């Protein structure tokens, strides 16, 4: 052990203090850098020189420079960001939906419904006035148009969510690819345990935080360890092995990246399904794996799964649209069922898709219920000259009696409806039921038209007793369409308002059908939503249910988002207290390391004087 060893002791202190100052300066200059993690120098004593009298110190050394990073708190931070972005995105979209459905006192669909039935009331009071017909049709057009617009608004919002989903998934793939590249760089730069690529790990953490805002993630970093060299350092991620996954679906495995893929071929609106492709090219639908972040919010809103015909079968916005469809369908069916009780010269149904002669009515449309209809024949004086009840049940078909009764067969039976022992003045003598099927278009058509022997001046009407038969098939209708996207006033009535009638009989001045239409607003009707469930409500009541559900969903999401915001703020503060730069602390450290540097320099100057003294003795 010589005097030069004492010189090296001072030099080691000088070098260590210099690195401490450089590291502290790095912290200070990056105090405002987003995602920067403050660093600390791990300084240890050099191995001592062993003598019989005891160990003699040989100075100090910098073992490594580490990030002040707590992996456990960082995991909580990514989780809190996932939860916050999930509810924040949902809140943003749901608030937009609520703005489109204001239903204020003097505007909105509820007010349109009220005015629509008020116009029916005015028409019932003046059934012979042409102007009242025009006003009623105009009122109906406003209501139906607003229903169409509301449905299309939801379509546009859902389309926008899907477009954003595509961008978000592409961003996830891009971030995951960057993380894999960083892992490759870490393998090259961290060639031994003393070299820490802190900046690369900061970049990877920043990418993880970005990714956590898009989706829920789980990162596994092997060789995570604890270091208690100083108070504010706890759990480190110093290992090279790295796996990033979404609920078990691996995105990054070391240097390898696995892409999330999208497919739009099975959707009628070009919506993307998310899948994961295995090595054998097997596709796995991973929509259910996304439970946090914006992507989960998007999927919850738009829907995750599709039916075989390309429609979304879940999703908040999908439910709203299905509820609007249920509202419109019941409105159409019930309105047309009432309107069909008004006498007309003939009845022709809509084109019935896939309804063959042997198709049961309830298989064609589950809105048709058990019950019966009463077919009535009127003369020009408004008197009923014949009537017949036809039962409808689960086995009733359009024109096949193999398993039960059929509409055509029951209508055309030669019966004595009037019980006058005359078989020539009954329903089948005045009108004939015909069902035609087009094999090419796969559509059918039901009609009730005058028989050849029927003299002019007779009219047919169908009064419904709970079956919804006439309204569902579109026999003598006031409204066209099947759902909220295409509900509208019958084109023929639209073109010629004179065709509108208000009575059940053809007698001028009869307002009995119009009165029945007015009463429809007070009756609880069945509404069957594909995803929203079944309810019995009045027309206004069901629409109010739709808007109340929208408001309730929005309020619930806002409450969840407020909670997640508070949690994220707390966790972020904890994270900043550990990994963020505290300027006062760094300035204090700078003064301390500056003092250490001066003290080490003093050791060197002292040894230098010792050497000078030694050299003078030699002279």
Task: Give the location of each predicted region.
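Structural signature of extracellular appendage/secretion-system components
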Residues: 1-619
């Amino acid at each position: 052990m010589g005097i030069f060893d004492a010189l090296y002791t001072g030099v080691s202190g000088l070098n260590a203090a210099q690195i401490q100052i450089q590291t502290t300066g790095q912290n200070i200059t990056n105090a405002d850098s987003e995602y920067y993690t403050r660093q600390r120098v791990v300084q240890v004593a050099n191995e001592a020189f062993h003598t019989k009298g005891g160990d003699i110190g040989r100075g100090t050394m910098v073992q490594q420079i580490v990030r002040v990073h707590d992996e456990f708190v960082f995991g909580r931070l990514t989780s809190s960001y996932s939860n916050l972005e999930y509810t924040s995105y949902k809140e943003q979209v749901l608030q937009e939906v609520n703005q489109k459905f204001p239903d204020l006192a003097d505007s909105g669909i509820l007010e349109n419904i009220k005015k629509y039935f008020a116009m029916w009331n005015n028409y019932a009071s003046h059934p012979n006035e042409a102007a009242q017909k025009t006003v009623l049709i105009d009122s109906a057009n406003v209501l139906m148009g607003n229903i169409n617009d509301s449905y299309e608004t939801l379509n546009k919002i859902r389309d926008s969510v899907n477009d954003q989903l595509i961008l978000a998934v592409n961003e996830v793939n891009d971030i995951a690819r960057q993380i894999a590249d960083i892992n490759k760089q870490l393998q090259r730069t961290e060639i031994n345990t003393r070299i820490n690529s802190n900046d690369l790990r900061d970049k990877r953490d920043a990418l993880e935080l970005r990714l956590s805002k898009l989706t829920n993630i789980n990162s596994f970093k092997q060789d995570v360890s604890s270091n208690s060299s100083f108070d504010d350092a706890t759990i480190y991620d110093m290992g090279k092995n790295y796996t990033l996954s979404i609920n078990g679906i691996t995105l990054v495995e070391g240097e390898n990246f696995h892409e999330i893929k999208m497919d739009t071929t099975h959707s009628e609106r070009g919506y993307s399904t998310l899948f994961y492709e295995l090595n054998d090219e097997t596709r796995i639908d991973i929509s259910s794996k996304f439970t946090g972040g914006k992507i989960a919010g998007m999927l919850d809103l738009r829907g995750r799964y599709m039916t075989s015909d390309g429609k979304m079968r879940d999703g908040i916005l999908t439910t709203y649209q299905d509820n609007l469809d249920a509202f419109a369908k019941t409105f159409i069916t019930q309105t047309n069922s009432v309107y069909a009780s008004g006498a007309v010269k003939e009845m022709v149904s809509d084109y019935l898709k896939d309804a063959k002669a042997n198709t049961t009515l309830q298989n064609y449309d589950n809105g048709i219920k058990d019950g019966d209809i009463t077919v009535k024949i009127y003369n020009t004086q408004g008197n009923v000259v014949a009537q017949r009840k036809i039962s409808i049940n689960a086995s009733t078909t359009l024109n096949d009696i193999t398993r039960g009764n059929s509409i055509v067969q029951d209508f055309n039976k030669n019966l004595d409806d009037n019980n006058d022992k005359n078989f020539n003045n009954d329903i089948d003598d005045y009108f004939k039921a015909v069902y035609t099927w087009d094999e090419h278009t796969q559509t059918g058509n039901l009609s009730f038209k005058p028989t050849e022997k029927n003299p002019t001046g007779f009219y047919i009407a169908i009064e419904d007793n709970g079956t919804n038969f006439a309204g569902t098939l579109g026999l003598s209708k006031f409204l066209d369409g099947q759902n909220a996207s295409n509900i509208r006033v019958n084109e023929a009535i639209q073109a010629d308002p004179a065709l509108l009638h208000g009575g059940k009989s053809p007698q001028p001045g009869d307002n009995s059908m119009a009165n029945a239409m007015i009463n429809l607003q007070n009756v609880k009707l069945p509404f069957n939503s594909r995803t929203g469930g079944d309810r019995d409500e009045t027309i206004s009541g069901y629409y109010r249910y739709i808007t109340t559900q929208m408001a309730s969903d929005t309020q619930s999401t806002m409450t969840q988002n407020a909670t997640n915001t508070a949690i994220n703020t707390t966790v972020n503060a904890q994270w900043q207290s550990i990994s963020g730069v505290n300027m006062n602390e760094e300035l204090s450290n700078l003064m301390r390391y500056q003092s250490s540097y001066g003290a080490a320099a003093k050791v060197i100057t002292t040894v230098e004087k010792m050497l000078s003294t030694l050299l003078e003795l030699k002279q």
